């Protein structure tokens, strides 16, 4: 705006011309208005009489027409209005009533327009509002709109009923029918016109001819009644058409521009400077008393009113310095026409959330403010509503003097569509609803207020918070306690939030200053990430999830640059870093590099740090304290020493804990195994897993050359760093028990020959200056910790909720191992073989078989030459006889062996009953000569095509030592020349000559894996046919060791049936599994037997169930007869997944020297295998079968597509 103020006044000649132009168009709607003329006559008379008559009840008619409003500072608003009524205004009212009647009958248009303005730049009150004057209307209504601030004083007409708005059609403003005759007024939704049945807010009338200025609250002058006339006639103008409004504005624009300047000057000459000062001071005090800004759209929706939008048309005067805003009632048609002409302009700025709207009834009870907020620049929107309390009463008084105009002239205040006032609650943030419950019930079809076309919705940040419902007032008195409590809680929360935001802003400034000192810009990746996290934390902590304004970063960056440029404000920041790591990785050298001076002596051949010590210094003006610790050792055997060192470190930092932990390791240390896990777990056990939450991984020797890749080419430096970082980060996650950890990694190079830049800073091969980056990471971690403590955010780390997920134990594997049948250990004299249980079945036939072999005639074997002379039939008979005799001989030998075992068993029992001395003599006599070690035969090795196939191998000896040590042959191992990949050792111990203990172990090692197996077993007999065994197994399962303790009891419940029951407990990793099994073996005969077993295994609430069935059918003379068939069935249920598998294996003799072996297996998932094998010692032509795969391979070379089945 300019410094001057313009008023545009329309002459009577123009008024008549406009009225004549509109007569022809108004005849169209004349018939519709005739129906409501009689009703409107009565209502308008009542409104005018109430508006003027209510003031006469308290005070006589004003006698002094020249009294000004400045003398009524302490009087109510009603008294001020009375004193301001002069005789020429009364006469003008009568003339206005007559003009209104004429206009109503002739459908006349708008009369004069008076503009009042307020200048914010030169100390004069300027209001860029062009209001219509309504001649003859005795209802009062006023409204003002400006770019910055419009304030309006309201007159209250007391009635006992609540104010309501009447919408004749239940539609929007453009469709309402309003008639004004005989000085009576009908109100409709959103136009602000008073209803004669209720208390209404009416605006004082300013006559157009006299030019007398009558200031209202805060120096605001009330517009003429033309505004109300224009608002009432909106419906008529819409029905008449769009042209009327356009013609009206076109005809009056030039004259308004010309006449505006003089009228404005005349009006403001009569307004004293004191009133201007009073008005501005009142506005300032109202703002300071905690007013609340109400959004027009949301208020209209809550009150259920239909508001009329007022569009401001900007008119520039001849000098070009001032702007006059013409306020007209805008219907949808008028909005479109004004948009086409391009007449609607404006300057709408965003309203800050701190700007609230309310009145302070105790300090300044006579003032009210009107604020407007528009979501679209260039257009000022205004919606008029009757504003009242719940019972329809207002206590509005005239303003008091205030002398603070100069402080408010430069501020910009938006125009708010709500007129709010509160007369009994001091600094009340809520705004009283403008619609009473009676109005809501009487007008259920009310629509939301229509906004002018082109106006967008305001920013969500500028919308006020939802207000608490208010209780109805009785006789003008509200529930003061309830409002006061709500105000106190809201104010306290707002103050706390503002204080937190300020502190967080200071943290931002501090971090930006740190980055500036380290030579890092705000666009650095680490800086940007920290600022993003701070903003995100503030948003999560803020009220109602409101987002942080973008100005926070800009303001913080500018403040940081100013403080660093001035160099007067010291930086209140210090950081303590504790360095941990293995011995020799460069901890002390890194500390020396950080301070750029020798703080600790280092030696490449001796251990540098032997005790915990700290050092302080300044780095770029920042106070840094570093704690150096002795080197740690990674092996398992050194963990006890590491615990002593770490406990001393823990005691040292007890009083002053570090802010950051820097764990150092070497970049060029290639280790993909878990060699560092013992050390990391020890650190976690001593300090707790939380030590890794603020840890930074530093990799020294960062200028190392990357190793060669798999194909011999050099790998990239970035890939080398990434792989090494991933290994260390993964190990730390496992040691901390939190797989979410992602510790940042920083590279370090302490060598004096490291490449440097122009500033003398050491640069890594990837171009990074490592020292500022390391310090920035350390400072960022502390800054985030400070913000976390300020915002009181939870870390969600109570103990170890995210413990490392250990692998679930393989329950099916453990259960199948449990179900396997194991032989029980026996004493040396009882090592008779596995067929002891069959001795009883064969005793009945021993006598017959013995006599059968002895009764055979003598038989003489033939030589090869003699057999060559025999015919084919003779040769067959000879071979059959030979085979029969051999079978009978083998049977006889087996019988003799069984008899010998029985005799030896009886003899051993008799020796135990004899005296000890006699038994020793018997053993000495029966003992033979000392055994001589003999070479053991070599194990068969697979064929090898290597040229260095050894012809000589050192053999092991069979000695008399009780330890049996043998090599372990692996036919498919990597060392196919030797085939020995492990060693096996066995020994049998006897405790008290009754309890056998068997110990066996095996170690297998190749280039990658190492497997260990250890088995210890013992058995005790406690009755005939009853025994109990106890065993301990240790074996490698994956990369962990599984320890199993098992026990089994066997007993013979029938002569041909044996039962067994067993338990097992397995410890694997950090899980314990327990299992139970039951087994039954039934021997039907020498040729058929069946074994059934079932069991269950559980761990961590998980269960696995399984069972096996094995049936064996063999030759009656087995093992002399080679026929054998085995049928197996297994069932496993784990996690509801049922696995069923079956297998069959059969061996059938074909002729005298050939066997056919067939195998087949199938499971319930459709997977299976079938194999057939034939071996023979005579039919060598079977080797021709090998031609088949060779022929197929040759075909694949000529027809490659056959290889893929195409």
Curated annotation (Swiss-Prot):
What GO molecular function annotations does the UniProt record carry, in alphabetical order? ATPase binding; GTP binding; GTPase activity; metal ion binding; protein-folding chaperone binding; transmembrane signaling receptor activity
- Tell me its EC number(s), please: 3.6.5.-
- Sequence positions that bind GTP: 584-589, 603-608, 701, 749-750
Provide GO CC annotations from the record. Answer: chloroplast outer membrane; plastid
Q: Where is the AIG1-type G domain?
A: 572-801
Q: Where is the composition biased (Polar residues)?
A: 309-324, 357-379, 468-492
According to the record, the segments passing through the membrane are: 1182-1199
Q: Which residues carry this modification: N-acetylglycine?
A: 2
Which positions does the record annotate as the modified residue Phosphoserine?
Answer: 195, 337, 363, 398
Q: What does the UniProt record say this protein does? A: GTPase involved in protein precursor import into chloroplasts. Seems to recognize chloroplast-destined precursor proteins and regulate their presentation to the translocation channel through GTP hydrolysis. Probably specialized in the import of nuclear encoded non-photosynthetic preproteins from the cytoplasm to the chloroplast.
Task: Tell me what this protein is called.
Answer: Translocase of chloroplast 132, chloroplastic
Encoded by which gene? TOC132
């Amino acid at each position: 705006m300019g410094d001057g103020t313009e008023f545009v006044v329309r002459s009577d000649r123009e008024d008549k011309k406009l009225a004549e132009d509109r007569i022809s168009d108004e005849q169209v709607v004349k018939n519709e208005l005739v129906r409501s003329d009689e009703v409107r006559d009565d209502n308008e008379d009542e409104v005018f009489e109430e508006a003027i008559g209510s003031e006469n009840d308290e005070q006589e008619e004003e006698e002094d027409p020249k009294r000004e409003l400045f003398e009524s500072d302490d009087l109510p608003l009603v008294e001020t209005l009375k004193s301001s009524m002069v005789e020429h205004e009364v006469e003008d009212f009568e003339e206005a009533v007559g003009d209104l009647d004429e206009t109503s009958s002739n459908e006349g248009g708008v009369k004069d327009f008076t503009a009042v303005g307020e200048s914010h730049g030169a100390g004069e009150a300027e209001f860029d509002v062009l209001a219509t004057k309504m001649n003859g209307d005795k209802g009062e209504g006023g409204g003002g709109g400006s770019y910055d601030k419009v304030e309006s004083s309201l007159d209250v007409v007391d009635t006992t009923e609540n104010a309501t708005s009447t919408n004749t059609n239940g539609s929007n403003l453009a469709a309402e029918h309003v008639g004004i005759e005989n000085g009576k007024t009908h109100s409709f939704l959103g136009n602000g016109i008073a209803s004669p049945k209720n208390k209404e807010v009416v605006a004082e009338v300013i006559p157009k001819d006299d030019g007398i200025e009558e200031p209202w609250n805060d120096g605001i002058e009330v517009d003429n009644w033309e505004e109300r006339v224009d608002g009432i006639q909106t419906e008529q103008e819409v029905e008449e058409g769009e042209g009327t409004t356009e013609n009206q504005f076109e005809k009056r624009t030039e004259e308004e521009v010309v006449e505006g300047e003089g009228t404005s000057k005349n009006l403001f000459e009569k307004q004293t400077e004191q009133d201007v000062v009073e008005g501005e001071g009142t506005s300032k005090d109202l703002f300071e008393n905690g007013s609340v800004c109400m959004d027009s759209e949301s208020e209209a929706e809550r009150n259920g009113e239909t508001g009329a939008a007022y569009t401001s048309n900007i008119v520039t005067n001849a000098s070009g310095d001032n702007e006059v805003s013409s306020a007209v009632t805008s219907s949808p048609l008028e909005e479109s026409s004004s948009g086409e002409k391009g007449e609607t302009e404006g300057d709408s700025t965003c309203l800050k959330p701190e700007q609230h709207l309310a009145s302070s009834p105790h300090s300044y009870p006579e003032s009210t403010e009107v604020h407007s907020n528009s979501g679209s620049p260039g257009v000022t929107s205004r919606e008029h509503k009757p504003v009242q309390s719940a019972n329809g009463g207002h206590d509005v008084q005239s303003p008091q003097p205030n002398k603070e105009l100069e402080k408010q002239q430069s501020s910009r205040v938006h125009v708010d569509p709500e007129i709010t006032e509160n007369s009994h609650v001091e600094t009340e943030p809520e705004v009283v609803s403008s619609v009473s419950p009676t109005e809501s019930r009487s007008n259920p079809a009310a629509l939301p207020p229509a906004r002018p076309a082109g106006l967008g919705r305001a920013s969500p940040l500028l919308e006020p918070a939802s207000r608490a419902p208010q209780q109805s007032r009785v006789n003008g008195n509200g529930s003061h306690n309830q409002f006061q409590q709500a105000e106190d809680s809201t104010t306290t929360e707002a103050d706390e939030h503002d204080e937190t935001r300020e502190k967080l802003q200071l943290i931002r400034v501090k971090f930006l200053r740190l980055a500036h000192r380290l030579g890092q810009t705000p666009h650095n990746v680490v800086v940007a990430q920290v600022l993003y996290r701070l903003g995100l934390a503030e948003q999560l902590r803020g009220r109602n999830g409101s987002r942080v304004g973008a100005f926070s970063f800009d303001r913080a960056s500018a403040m940081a640059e100013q403080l660093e440029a001035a160099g007067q404000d010291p930086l209140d920041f210090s950081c303590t870093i504790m360095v941990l790591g293995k011995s020799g990785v460069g901890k002390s050298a890194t500390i020396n590099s950080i301070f750029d001076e020798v703080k600790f002596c280092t030696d490449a051949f001796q251990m540098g740090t032997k005790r915990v010590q700290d050092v302080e210094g300044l780095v770029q003006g920042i106070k840094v304290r570093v704690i150096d610790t002795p080197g740690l050792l990674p092996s398992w055997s050194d963990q006890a020493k590491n615990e002593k060192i770490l406990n001393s470190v823990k005691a040292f930092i007890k009083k002053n804990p570090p802010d950051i932990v820097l764990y150092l390791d070497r970049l060029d240390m290639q280790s993909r195994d878990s060699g560092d896990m013992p050390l990391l777990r020890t650190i976690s056990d001593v300090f707790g897993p939380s030590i890794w939450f603020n840890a930074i991984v530093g990799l020294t020797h960062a200028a190392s050359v990357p190793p060669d890749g798999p194909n011999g080419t050099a790998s990239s430096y970035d890939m080398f760093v990434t792989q090494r970082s991933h290994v260390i980060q993964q190990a730390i996650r496992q040691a901390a028990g939190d797989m979410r950890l992602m510790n940042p990694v920083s590279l370090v190079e302490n060598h004096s020959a490291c490449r440097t830049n122009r500033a003398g800073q050491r640069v890594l091969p990837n171009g990074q200056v490592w020292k500022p980056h390391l310090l920035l990471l350390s400072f960022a971690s502390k800054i985030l910790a400070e913000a976390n403590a300020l915002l009181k955010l939870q870390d969600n780390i109570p103990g170890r909720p995210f413990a490392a997920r250990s692998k679930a134990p393989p329950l099916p594997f453990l259960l199948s191992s449990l179900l396997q049948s194991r032989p029980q250990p026996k004493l040396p004299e009882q090592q008779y073989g596995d067929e002891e249980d069959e001795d009883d079945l064969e005793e009945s036939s021993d006598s017959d078989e013995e006599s059968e072999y002895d009764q055979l005639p003598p038989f003489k074997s033939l030589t090869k030459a003699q057999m060559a002379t025999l015919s084919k039939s003779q040769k067959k008979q000879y071979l059959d006889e030979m085979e029969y005799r051999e079978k009978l001989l083998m049977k006889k030998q087996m019988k003799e062996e069984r008899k010998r075992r029985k005799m030896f068993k009886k003899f051993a029992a008799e020796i135990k009953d004899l005296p000890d001395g006699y038994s020793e003599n018997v053993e000495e006599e029966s003992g033979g000569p000392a055994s001589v070690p003999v070479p053991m035969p070599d194990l068969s090795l697979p064929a090898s095509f290597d040229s260095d196939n050894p012809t000589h191998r050192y053999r092991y000896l069979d000695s008399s030592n009780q330890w049996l040590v043998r090599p372990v042959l692996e036919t498919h191992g990597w060392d196919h020349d030797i085939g020995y990949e492990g060693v096996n050792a066995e020994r049998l111990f006897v405790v008290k000559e009754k309890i056998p203990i068997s110990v066996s172990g095996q170690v297998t090692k190749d280039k990658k894996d190492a497997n260990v197996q250890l088995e210890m077993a013992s058995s005790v007999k406690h009755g005939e046919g009853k025994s109990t065994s106890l065993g301990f197994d240790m074996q490698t399962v994956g990369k962990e060791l599984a320890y199993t303790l098992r026990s089994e009891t066997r007993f013979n419940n029938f002569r041909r049936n044996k039962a067994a029951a067993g338990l097992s407990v397995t410890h694997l990793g950090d899980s314990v599994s327990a299992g139970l099994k039951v087994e039954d073996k039934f021997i039907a005969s020498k040729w058929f037997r069946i074994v059934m077993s079932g069991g269950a295994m559980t761990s961590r609430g998980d269960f696995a169930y399984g069972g096996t069935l094995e049936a064996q059918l063999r030759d009656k003379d087995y093992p002399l007869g080679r026929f054998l068939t085995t049928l197996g069935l297994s069932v496993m249920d784990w996690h509801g997944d049922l696995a069923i598998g079956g297998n069959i294996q059969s061996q059938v003799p074909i002729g005298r020297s050939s066997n056919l072996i067939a195998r087949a297996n199938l499971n319930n998932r459709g997977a299976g295998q079938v194999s057939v094998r034939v071996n023979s010692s005579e039919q060598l032509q079977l080797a021709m079968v090998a031609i088949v795969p060779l022929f197929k391979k040759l075909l694949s070379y000529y027809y490659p597509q056959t290889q893929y089945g195409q």
